[in-house]
Amino acid sequence: MKREDFVFNGSGDVRLHGCVLMPENDVRAILQITHGMTEHIGRYEKLAEKLTEKGIAVCGFDLRGHGLNESQMNIATMGKDGWEASLNDMHRIYSLFHGKYPDAPYFMLGFSLGSFLLREYISRHPKEMKGAIIAGTGCQPAFVLEIMKFIVSTQIAKNGFDDTTDLVRKLSFDTYNDKFKPCRTRFDWLCSDEAQLDEYMNDDACRRDISSGLFHQLLSSMKRTGQQHACVGWNKEMPVLLMSGKDDPVGNMGKGVVQILHNMEKHGFKDVKLCLYEKARHDIFHEYENGTADKVTAEIVRWIGDNI
């Protein structure tokens, strides 16, 4: 595997860090990854190692306000136009690597916050990709999201768009953690593998909190993608792989992801597969201790291979 880090001009000419991990031999396919909230693209190197062994190149970038990009070091925030800009950033990476390898089937993976970005991206570019992997996603009742948006808007008025508050911390992370009391850390809901959780918390490229503004943007996206007609404009022939832990509060312990599956089937999608993993929490890519992460990697390798 060969890794290349690079900097590119994102939407609005914002400089963003990206990387691509290339197989030693010919490129059979490309997987573009959009990472989750507060983390960065470098956390997917183990997954990329297995994919590159099969000739699948892996590319991605640190979302604005995340990872190696210039920003506040403790709070992830994408700026007032950041959600829309990030969708455009995703398309710039697609254009870059599809342009280099126009004959390689192109797949996209979105995890957590990245899953909601990907779901919106597919609505805008339904014909671009060969298949989509949507991991760590969910859906919530619209009225609940509206109430939360209103509360968060009061916090934006109080402390600003790019800052956070104790109430936003509670709504964004701590509520999820309540399901796993007694808790060792603020982030027990992410992963049951304590070694991996400690690695995440000690990673200087990971943020500790999200801004009130970014949380409001995420809630807005959750509302948009949660509408029953949200997938109507997608390519119904495109293979879709849904992945989630059965103990993931973002996916309502599996129930929300099943709801997404049923909605897609109702709208006539031909090839949707759901993988729910027992005893796995939100970050299925780092649940190594109970074997989930290895199963997830093997499934992705197999699924892409079957759809090339």
Label every model-predicted segment.
Residues 35-39, 112, 246-247:
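Active-site glycine-rich loops that stabilize anionic/oxyanionic intermediates
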Residues 79-99:
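Alpha/beta-hydrolase active-site loop
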Residues 267, 271-308:
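Catalytic active-site module of serine/aspartate enzymes centered on a nucleophile-bearing elbow/loop
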Residues 242-244:
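Short beta-strand/loop motif that positions the catalytic acidic residue
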Residues 1-25:
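N-terminal cap/lid segment of alpha/beta-hydrolase-fold proteins
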Residues 43, 48-73:
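Conserved alpha/beta-hydrolase
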Residues 120-205:
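Alpha/beta-hydrolase-fold enzymes
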Residues 101-112:
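Alpha/beta-hydrolase fold nucleophile elbow
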